[in-house]
Amino acid sequence: MVLVSCSSHKKSSTEMEIVKNELEKIRIIDQYCATNGRPPDKFKDYPIEKWNNFKDSVYQKNQQKIEAYLDKYGYLGFNEIGEHSSNILRLVAQHSDKNINFQKRILTELKVQVDKKNAKASNYAYLYDRVKINSNQMQYYATQVEYNKLGQAIPKKLEDSINIDARRIEYSLMPLKKYLNLLTKNHFEMNKDYFLKRGITEPKLYK
């Protein structure tokens, strides 16, 4: 009898196409939830608590699907499913804040693939910071932010801020000021009506 481990499961091209299609469905619903802090028109009758509960249920279902893929195939990188689809694994982990053990599992397996050039270094940096913040520790790459009353993105607690841009460049991340301004612009556009009512007519960018 020959025993085959989960990680050595043969990855046929047809099977990987099915996985890629399923991952794309996961990405679409993940982003729908992640980009709507308040109930969108389709869910306009939902109070905010019910909408948040719905989002949590979506994230949990997505997480379970990704875990099933990990158990069956191991971490799927560029070589297996291409860059776009592989990025979705980290995306799902990023939004699984209520299951830090799952985030840590993805982080560990992602690092192995990054070292093999089979996954994006920036994905590792984003998830590393997320796990640190969720563990009440300092982040290292300044990917995780909050917003002040003016709508400006501000890094959450950060270790060694002096050398931050050097670390970000090493992990294929844009310079911090450019990143914060990008997030500030996006935040303003997503909440434009709110800011206009407060007399803020444009995003407050860092100079």
Show which residues each predicted segment covers.
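Alpha-helical solenoid repeat scaffolds
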Residues: N123-K132, E159, F195, I200, ...
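Short secondary-structure boundary/hinge segments and terminal tails
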Residues: C6-S8, I88, N186
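Bacterial Sec-dependent N-terminal signal peptides
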Residues: M1-M16, K207
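Short acidic, Pro/Gly- and aromatic-enriched capping/linker segments at domain boundaries
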Residues: G151-R167
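Polybasic, proline/glycine-rich intrinsically disordered low-complexity segments
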Residues: Y140, E146-L150
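General secondary-structure edge motif
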Residues: Y46, R90, Y147-N148, E159
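A cross-kingdom marker for long, charged
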Residues: N163-K207
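N-terminal helix-rich structural modules
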Residues: K10-S135, A142
